[in-house]
Amino acid sequence: MAEPDPSHPLETQAGKVQEAQDSDSDSEGGAAGGEADMDFLRNLFSQTLSLGSQKERLLDELTLEGVARYMQSERCRRVICLVGAGISTSAGIPDFRSPSTGLYDNLEKYHLPYPEAIFEISYFKKHPEPFFALAKELYPGQFKPTICHYFMRLLKDKGLLLRCYTQNIDTLERIAGLEQEDLVEAHGTFYTSHCVSASCRHEYPLSWMKEKIFSEVTPKCEDCQSLVKPDIVFFGESLPARFFSCMQSDFLKVDLLLVMGTSLQVQPFASLISKAPLSTPRLLINKEKAGQSDPFLGMIMGLGGGMDFDSKKAYRDVAWLGECDQGCLALAELLGWKKELEDLVRREHASIDAQSGAGVPNPSTSASPKKSPPPAKDEARTTEREKPQ
C-alpha cells in the first residue's frame, strides 16, 4: 500500500510546518516542528540572498554515467533516497493518481463522498469500514519488495545509505532489509497501530491489526473500545516528529540525493530536495520529470531549490525517465553491481516464498535477467503539475 498523500496539494511548506507545531506544542513533534519552521526561514534567506553553501559542479556530465562515476568517487559517501509510490507499482501495489489504475480511480465500491475521504481522519472516525476494507485488499505482507527496494538495500550493505525517506506505507523497505534507523517513514507505517482516544493511545503490533483486518472486524481498543488506527498519516494529521528531527541533520551532510518514483507534489516531503547543500547532485528516476519549481514562486514562498534538468545553468540535476526498476538496474550496471543486485532479489524473493509456503515466484516482482535499457537522455519531456507518478 503506497503513499496516502497526507496533505492537500495546495498546502505550502510553511502551512504544514505550522500545522505540525499547532498540533501539540508541548510534544516532541511540536519542538521538531519549531525547528522545521526555523529551517524554512533559513532556507528562504539562503535561496533569496544566496547565503549558505556555494554551487560547485561535482558531476563530470549530467547523465546517469556521470552520476555513476561520482558514486564511485571518494566524494560520494552518504546517499539519501527520497521515494514514493512509483517504486512499489511493479510489486502490484497501485499508486494514487494514475488514470484508471490509480487508487483514487478505483474506490467507487466504497461509496465515498469523494476519493480522498478514505484517508481523512474525520471521515475515518465516523466511517472506518471503507478504510479497513481497502486495507484488507492492499495489506502489507502480501507483496514482495521490488528491484528499487533492493537497490537501496545494496546502498545500505555498501555503507552508502545515509537515510531513506519514504512516502510509502507498504513497509516494503523493511521487508527488503532496511532497519528502523535507516528509515524516515514520512507518511507513517502499518508496522504499529494506536487507539485514537487521546486519553488512551494504547499501542498494538502489526500481527494484532492484521488479525482484525482479515477477520473483517473493525479494530477496537481492548482498554477503552475506541477505534484503533494504523500509524499512517491521514489528511488532518501531522507528520511524525522523526521526519523533522532527521531532516535537520541528514541534509547537512548528504553527498547525493536519489529521488525515485514520486511526483514531488506533496508538501512538506517535496521540499526535501531543496534541503541539501547547493553542490549536492540530485538524480531523479521516474516516469516523468518532477520537482521543477517556478523560480518566482520559489523566491516568494520559500520553495526554491527545484530541479533544473534543462536550462543552461543546470549543473547538478539528472533525470532518468522510465520504470524505476529499470532505472536502478541501469545504474547498478554502470556501478558494476548488476549481478549482485539480481542475485540479491532472487535470493530474498525465494526466502519470502519459502516463508509464506507459496513456493512460486511472483511474476510482478521477478528479477529474471532483463536487458537493461540504455541510460535515458535528457530530452525535454513535458510534465504537468497534476501528472501521476
UniProtKB/Swiss-Prot annotation:
Co-factor: note: Binds 1 zinc ion per subunit.
UniProt keyword terms in alphabetical order: Acetylation, Autophagy, Cell cycle, Cell division, Cell membrane, Cell projection, Chromosome, Cytoplasm, Cytoskeleton, Differentiation, Immunity, Innate immunity, Meiosis, Membrane, Metal-binding, Microtubule, Mitosis, NAD, Neurodegeneration, Neurogenesis, Nucleus, Phosphoprotein, Transcription, Transcription regulation, Transferase, Ubl conjugation, Zinc
Post-translational events: Phosphorylated at phosphoserine and phosphothreonine. Phosphorylated at Ser-368 by a mitotic kinase CDK1/cyclin B at the G2/M transition; phosphorylation regulates the delay in cell-cycle progression. Phosphorylated at Ser-368 by a mitotic kinase G1/S-specific cyclin E/Cdk2 complex; phosphorylation inactivates SIRT2-mediated alpha-tubulin deacetylation and thereby negatively regulates cell adhesion, cell migration and neurite outgrowth during neuronal differentiation.
Impact noted for substituting S53A: Reduces deacetylase activity
Cofactor: Zn(2+)
Outcome reported for the amino acid change (mutating S100A): Reduces deacetylase activity
Catalytic activity, EC: 2.3.1.286, 2.3.1.-
Activity regulation statement: Inhibited by Sirtinol, A3 and M15 small molecules. Inhibited by nicotinamide. Inhibited by a macrocyclic peptide inhibitor S2iL5. Inhibited by EP300-induced acetylation.
Major location category of this protein: nucleus
UniProt GO cellular component terms: centriole; centrosome; chromatin silencing complex; chromosome; chromosome, telomeric region; cytoplasm; cytosol; glial cell projection
Known catalytic reactions: N(6)-acetyl-L-lysyl-[protein] + NAD(+) + H2O = 2''-O-acetyl-ADP-D-ribose + nicotinamide + L-lysyl-[protein]; N(6)-tetradecanoyl-L-lysyl-[protein] + NAD(+) + H2O = 2''-O-tetradecanoyl-ADP-D-ribose + nicotinamide + L-lysyl-[protein]; N(6)-hexadecanoyl-L-lysyl-[protein] + NAD(+) + H2O = 2''-O-hexadecanoyl-ADP-D-ribose + nicotinamide + L-lysyl-[protein]
N-acetylalanine modification, residue list: A2
Organ and tissue specificity: Isoform 1 is expressed in heart, liver and skeletal muscle, weakly expressed in the cortex. Isoform 2 is strongly expressed in the cortex, weakly expressed in heart and liver. Weakly expressed in several malignancies including breast, liver, brain, kidney and prostate cancers compared to normal tissues. Weakly expressed in glioma cell lines compared to normal brain tissues (at protein level). Widely expressed. Highly expressed in heart, brain and skeletal muscle, while it is weakly expressed in placenta and lung.
Entry's Gene Ontology BP terms: autophagy; cell division; cellular response to caloric restriction; cellular response to epinephrine stimulus; cellular response to hypoxia; cellular response to oxidative stress; epigenetic regulation of gene expression; heterochromatin formation
Recorded consequence of changing S364A: Abolishes CDK2-dependent phosphorylation
Effect of S271A: Reduces binding for the peptide inhibitor S2iL5
Residue sites binding NAD(+) per the record: 85-89, 95-97, 167-170, 262-263, 286-288, 324
Function: NAD-dependent protein deacetylase, which deacetylates internal lysines on histone and alpha-tubulin as well as many other proteins such as key transcription factors. Participates in the modulation of multiple and diverse biological processes such as cell cycle control, genomic integrity, microtubule dynamics, cell differentiation, metabolic networks, and autophagy. Plays a major role in the control of cell cycle progression and genomic stability.
Protein name: NAD-dependent protein deacetylase sirtuin-2
Native species: Homo sapiens
Gene name linked to the record: SIRT2
